[in-house]
Amino acid sequence: MLMLFVFGVLLHEVSLSGQNEAPPNTHSIPGEPLYNYASIRLPEEHIPFFLHNNRHIATVCRKDSLCPYKKHLEKLKYCWGYEKSCKPEFRFGYPVCSYVDMGWTDTLESAEDIFWKQADFGYARERLEEMHVLCQPKETSDSSLVCSRYLQYCRATNLYLDLRNIKRNHDRFKEDFFQSGEIGGHCKLDIRTLTSEGQRKSPLQSWFAELQSYTQLNFRPIEDAKCDIVIEKPTYFMKLDAGVNMYHHFCDFINLYITQHVNNSFSTDVYIVMWDTSSYGYGDLFSDTWNAFTDYDVIHLKTYDSKRVCFKEAVFSLLPRMRYGLFYNTPLISGCQNTGLFRAFAQHVLHRLNITQEGPKDGKIRVTILARSTEYRKILNQNELVNALKTVSTFEVQIVDYKYRELGFLDQLRITHNTDIFIGMHGAGLTHLLFLPDWAAVFELYNCEDERCYLDLARLRGVHYITWRRQNKVFPQDKGHHPTLGEHPKFTNYSFDVEEFMYLVLQAADHVLQHPKWPFKKKHDEL
């Protein structure tokens, strides 16, 4: 498989064969299935797409009377979109553009294609098309290194890491962490191409700093017994953004999910190693999310200090702050929304974390207000706004404060996913919009002059977004007082005109009731 994969890269035909999925058991005990279908653990809607890229499993399913996915065998033309043979009409959704951003293009069709490549499964296709071999194996027992452009994603086999002489300090992403001979493999290294990929060298944008010392070794690390530890399981290396901020940390998770697509494996029987060159720990308020990606605790790189460690299969994951990456500071064409990629990500995470939809409720719209107990961006007349909402009998209103010490992240997700209108001030908590149902609306009560952040995230996810528009009807407590920047709209609190607030919420409700996926078709005049 290794040689096929590498030669496939050379031919620009990256194998999509489920490299990490368990092989079918063709000699199973009578009365038992030929494959462990329960290990797939994907939402029902994703199964045809999985089988499209794992035809060996589809073939077994066709022969197996106990396969639960037979109904999907007639849908094997369905594809995510990054596969070379994928026809547009069978893709997992396609973005919609309501107008043409003339700064980018001049037709709706080309606008949709641009957005699909920027932020949908077209983004994964571009990474696959960039793949090239940097270290070529000669035999099946050799090592290999295959990377996308700028070393934003890499895949290595029989990787050797020598951490016996490592010196750690406060720097989480030390650039000269490895010296020559301390990271590498037994393969023919294209050193010129490797060193030419450093244009985006930066801690959370590229793996260049970590792999620039990759060395062509004169020994086979595993075969020649040069390893103190051999890691048999596939391992994902990740450099993580801030684990205390949902917006930044979910840049980690979405890029891990895209990496799984590029790698064509959604197995949770994998290790995840946090690449951190410091001796510090890592504060993670959203650690439950890892259960969607691995069966094991996340491993800190320092766990392997003072040892030579060899990884049979290693993946260097796409990173959270890549230039033109997703979704931190991503320049997006205007007028387009609804990516299949972000919808699939939300479905994937919710399914694996067992977060279910308990509604919607006939005759009710579930409204959730996200309160803030922080010093800034509080809603000063919150009670007044809530009382106004409660005058509408259709609204079922709840106020939540997503404080991790009082409400676990899984409970937060259950509330969010069972919300039809989600209201909150500008802040990382609005990242919850990723997990709203498709028909929902998010109301960023006030964006504090940061106009694109959650508007763009809502566009990516495909949920309706509104925010406050009339400046004469929002009342800041003062001009704001940033500790170093002086006056700043994010560093104060706000009151809002009740009538204008209700007008905007009713607009959001109107969207919910008219959404194609809203199951109740009653007239909304009662609002």
From Swiss-Prot:
<dbReference type="Pfam" id="PF04577">
    <property type="entry name" value="Glyco_transf_61"/>
</dbReference>
<comment type="function">
    <text>Catalyzes the transfer of a single N-acetylglucosamine from UDP-GlcNAc to a serine or threonine residue in extracellular proteins resulting in their modification with a beta-linked N-acetylglucosamine (O-GlcNAc). Specifically glycosylates the Thr residue located between the fifth and sixth conserved cysteines of folded EGF-like domains.</text>
</comment>
<dbReference type="GO" id="GO:0097363">
    <property type="term" value="F:protein O-acetylglucosaminyltransferase activity"/>
</dbReference>
<feature type="short sequence motif" description="Required for optimal activity">
    <location>
        <begin position="295"/>
        <end position="297"/>
    </location>
</feature>
<keyword id="KW-0732">Signal</keyword>
<protein>
    <recommendedName>
        <fullName>EGF domain-specific O-linked N-acetylglucosamine transferase</fullName>
        <ecNumber>2.4.1.255</ecNumber>
    </recommendedName>
</protein>
<keyword id="KW-0328">Glycosyltransferase</keyword>
<dbReference type="GO" id="GO:0006493">
    <property type="term" value="P:protein O-linked glycosylation"/>
</dbReference>
<dbReference type="InterPro" id="IPR049625">
    <property type="entry name" value="Glyco_transf_61_cat"/>
</dbReference>
<dbReference type="InterPro" id="IPR007657">
    <property type="entry name" value="Glycosyltransferase_61"/>
</dbReference>
<comment type="similarity">
    <text>Belongs to the glycosyltransferase 61 family.</text>
</comment>
<keyword id="KW-0256">Endoplasmic reticulum</keyword>
<keyword id="KW-0325">Glycoprotein</keyword>
<feature type="signal peptide">
    <location>
        <begin position="1"/>
        <end position="17"/>
    </location>
</feature>
<dbReference type="GO" id="GO:0005788">
    <property type="term" value="C:endoplasmic reticulum lumen"/>
</dbReference>
<feature type="glycosylation site" description="N-linked (GlcNAc...) asparagine">
    <location>
        <position position="354"/>
    </location>
</feature>
<keyword id="KW-0225">Disease variant</keyword>
<feature type="short sequence motif" description="Prevents secretion from ER">
    <location>
        <begin position="524"/>
        <end position="527"/>
    </location>
</feature>
<keyword id="KW-0808">Transferase</keyword>
<dbReference type="GO" id="GO:0097370">
    <property type="term" value="P:protein O-GlcNAcylation via threonine"/>
</dbReference>
